[in-house]
Amino acid sequence: MAIEKSIASSSIAEVIDRVLDKGVVIDAFVRVALVGIELIAIEARVVIASVETWLKYAEAIGLTAQPSAA
């Protein structure tokens, strides 16, 4: 079975569709210090996904509110 490489370029719409379908998480921590004195610290978590994708994975790890049984 031969491996085929695709040399066709992706359009921006295809890239955005794939990112929204699969999701991307960026976790960053930046600290700026001068002579051992911390001047600024920035912590950021960025999630890029469609609402459907986020809800699917958020429910799997328990981040969504569970409906109460009435």
Swiss-Prot record:
Quaternary data: The gas vesicle shell is 2 nm thick and consists of a single layer of this protein. It forms helical ribs nearly perpendicular to the long axis of the vesicle.
Chief location category: other
Family: Belongs to the gas vesicle GvpA family.
NCBIfam families, per the entry: PRK09371.1
Alphabetic keyword roster: Gas vesicle
Task of the protein: Gas vesicles are hollow, gas filled proteinaceous nanostructures found in some microorganisms. During planktonic growth they allow positioning of the organism at a favorable depth for light or nutrient acquisition. GvpA forms the protein shell.
Full protein name: Gas vesicle protein A
Subcellular localization, as worded in the UniProt entry: Gas vesicle shell
Cellular component terms per the entry's GO annotation: gas vesicle shell; vesicle membrane
Pfam families assigned: Gas_vesicle (PF00741)
Superkingdom: Bacteria
GO molecular function, one term: structural molecule activity
